[in-house]
Amino acid sequence: MADLDYIKNRIREMSLTSMLSAANSVQNRSNVSTVHALFDIAKCGIKYSAGYTDYLNNAFETKTPDERRETITRGVNNAYVRKLNSPDLDSCFNDKRQLYALYRDFISRDIMDIEKASADNLKAFVGDNVKIVVRKPDAKGNDGTFVLNLFGVNDFENLRERLLNMGLSLAERLVTQHREMERLCGESVAVIRVVTVNNVAVFACLNSVYGKLKLTAPINEKTGVITSSALDQQNGMFHRHPLTDRRFYGFKIPLWHDVISLAERASLVLSSVKYCGFYIAVLPDKPELIDATSFPRHDYYRVCDNSVLRRKIEQRISNEIN
């Protein structure tokens, strides 16, 4: 049974319009009525701590009560975070400047704090590069992060002022991906997301952004091989990458053992944060940490066998306690 605080918060946050939209989606893909779906979504929110997005992502209308109980829902994921991570360290992950300092041993790309730099410093940082990455210090994932094309830019005083006015106070070198990653994803942004529990990798996926599409494909964390086709934000399936036409299934991520090693070594940095998500790029000769979070997003778990992952996570928690 979900705890009362969670239920009260979810009821407060619930949007009837969104719930009706979710119920209509369930009706369109199954034989149940919209009214039945709406009541079932509400029931699952209370009984399994599942939001309507959980319901849609995990096709709850097709699951038995036992299967629903075994699914990692929003409430279950929140419980993992509360159990394994100290909230006192949230600020380390919410401010990229603190984050980069904390994980500096896993970051090799040049990074500049534009607030502390002059226009001449910014010009020197850009150098001959046509593109750089700019971020808000509190950026979450790809939100608040942009690739900036500087072709023809000569007024760096104006550029600096405009960036700061938009809150984009961090500048970074654009990383060069491994050739094999480019063969799969082309020039689209691609990162490996690795989740660790008690310093051991339990989940991995590829995330490739192409235009408005955000494609996610599961990776076997032991072998580095993609185990199925990719899903987009609406759970549409992509057997091939739309930019390169290469198959997702069966693709082996290069330098895989180095990727997992980086994530597991990085998970040791903060002993009181035991449930971590690491976002890693694969460069030509090594992996590079791009971002980290103390609140791994559970919606990525929809691409794998969710119940198997839940047992794996809870076994890691149990092993540590015992």
PLM regions with names:
Residues R10-F125, K140:
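Conserved N-proximal alpha/beta basic substrate-recognition cap immediately N-terminal to
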Residues L4, N9, D245-S261, L268-Y275, ...:
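C-terminal active-site "lid" helix and adjoining low-complexity regulatory extension at the edge
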Residues I132, V202, E288-D291:
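Protein kinase-like catalytic core scaffold
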Residues F151-Q233:
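Phosphate-binding site of ATP-dependent enzymes
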Residues K123-V133:
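Acidic/histidine-enriched active-site and ligand-binding environments that engage anionic O-linkages
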Residues I132-L159:
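Glycine-rich phosphate-binding loop of ATP-grasp-fold ATP-dependent ligases
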Residues S228-F251, D258:
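Conserved catalytic alpha/beta cores of large enzymes that bind or transform nucleotide phosphates
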Residues D138-K140, T176-Q177, S208-Y210, A281-V282, ...:
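Short, solvent-exposed loop/turn segments at secondary-structure junctions
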